Design a protein with these regions (language model features):
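N-terminal subdomain of nucleotide-sugar transferases
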Residues: 1-42
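Conserved donor-binding/catalytic core segment of Leloir-type glycosyltransferases
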Residues: 4, 181-207, 222
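Short alpha-helical donor nucleotide-sugar binding micro-motif in glycosyltransferases
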Residues: 73, 128, 251-252, 259-264
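Donor nucleotide-sugar binding/catalytic pocket of nucleotide-sugar-dependent glycosyltransferases
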Residues: 103, 124-171, 176
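Nucleotide-activated donor-binding/catalytic signature segment of Leloir-type glycosyltransferases, i.e.
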Residues: 234-252
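Aromatic "clamp/platform" in nucleotide-sugar-dependent glycosyltransferases that forms part
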Residues: 272
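Short hydrophobic beta-strand element within catalytic cores of glycosyltransferases
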Residues: 289-292
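Conserved acidic donor-binding segment of nucleotide-sugar-dependent glycosyltransferases
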Residues: 304-305, 309-316, 325-330
């Protein structure tokens, strides 16, 4: 099939989609407002004059490119068109007079954008209702999005490469009893963007409480990621007196993220908002037990009580207690970790998830008309 993605070419998730479908023998074109190269795929870059991190007002410049998008699609004549992110690329697709196309919602386009104003809400409704087929990475996000459209969603989770994300990255470690008697650190952490919605401040405060209430615990905190609150969080760690046990790893690529998760005794994802818990899925694939906050997108990505421990969001004390209990119980860490990998490999393995999307494409490709 000829598949055309209308999505940011420099985004990791876009690239993952392109690589998988290219490797299946499909011809891939990407229409993007950001520059980027994707091996084996054709990227049609449109300079909209708005940066990827520009304001909503700046990104209105995307919309005047609808005619250009139409022209490119008309030239490609794809069998499948899939726009990604409802309130930028999805809106352009809605204005471009395209054949029936798919729209994949991502997260902030559903959870944050429509709450800014009535105009933002109407823009999202317009985008959702113009698409022929709607895709969501989670049931939780589909439920949230259903406030803005009566159209049904097909659930297409973000898949994880279970060969890359694997306990084999650090064979033989982690399942001994972690305490000061054997001199090994208790390594906890997360791999997330450093912004308020992901609960990084809660994680820092919980770590400080754990250290204060149980000074015998040899805890080491690892945080991988970049983001707008980075300086604020580093200052908070210093204020809390945990800067000497906190390792700020910065942005790391997927290969290093797999190693980071596999090397942890416990993964922490205390998000306050999450469309789908990709980080929790990656951690579980590495046999790393996880503690998550009680938000639907994270709970859907785990099996609470079987592969994860759930604590209330924004509650550092409850998180600190869960971290301590996980430290004390090596058997529980082992059982959660083993169950987590089994769950992910059976439910969210990369090929399983993309094969489902491919089958959806095949089923509807015959309905896609030429421009």
């Amino acid at each position: 099939m000829k598949i055309c993605f209308i999505a940011p070419a420099n985004n990791y998730h876009t690239q993952k989609w392109c690589h998988w479908f290219r490797n299946r023998g499909h011809q891939i074109d990407v229409i993007s407002f950001t520059e980027g190269e994707i091996e084996g795929c054709t990227v049609h870059y449109i300079n909209s004059g708005a940066g990827v991190r520009g304001s909503d007002a700046q990104k209105l410049k995307y919309l005047v490119q609808a005619r250009k998008v139409h022209e490119i699609v008309n030239e490609i004549k794809p069998d499948v068109i899939n726009a990604h992110y409802a309130t930028s690329y999805g809106t352009v697709a809605a204005l471009a007079n395209l054949p029936p196309y798919y729209l994949s919602v991502w997260g902030s386009d559903i959870y944050d954008f429509p709450k800014k104003s009535i105009l933002h809400r109407m823009m999202l409704q317009f985008s959702l209702n113009r698409a022929a087929y709607l895709l969501s990475t989670s049931k939780a996000m589909a439920k949230e999005a259903s406030q803005y459209t009566q159209k049904p969603f097909t659930i297409t989770p973000f898949g994880v490469d279970c060969e890359l994300f694997s306990p084999d990255k650090t064979p033989g470690k982690r399942y001994d009893v972690v305490n000061t008697r054997n001199g090994r650190d208790y390594v906890i952490g997360t791999v997330k963007s450093l912004s308020d919605k992901y609960g990084i401040a809660t994680l820092l405060r919980a770590t400080a409480l754990l250290k204060k209430q149980h000074p015998e615990v040899p805890v080491q905190l690892r945080i991988a990621g970049k983001g707008p609150q980075e300086d604020e969080y580093k200052a908070l760690a210093k204020e809390l007196g945990i800067e000497n046990i906190t390792n700020w790893m910065g942005f790391i690529p997927q290969e290093q993220a797999a190693l980071a998760w596999a090397s942890m005794d416990c993964g922490i994802t205390p998000s306050e908002s999450e469309s789908f818990g990709v980080s929790a899925v990656e951690a579980q694939a590495c046999c790393t037990p996880v503690i998550i906050s009680d938000i639907p997108g994270l709970m859907e990505a785990t099996m609470p009580g079987k592969t994860s421990v759930v604590v209330p969001r924004k509650h550092p004390q409850e998180l600190a207690q869960a971290m301590f209990e996980m430290y004390m119980d090596a058997d529980k860490r082992y059982e959660l970790g083993q169950a987590g990998r089994k769950f992910v490999c059976e439910t969210y393995e990369l090929n399983l998830c993309f094969e489902k999307i491919e089958e959806i494409y095949f089923q509807n490709a015959k309905k896609t008309e030429r421009c």
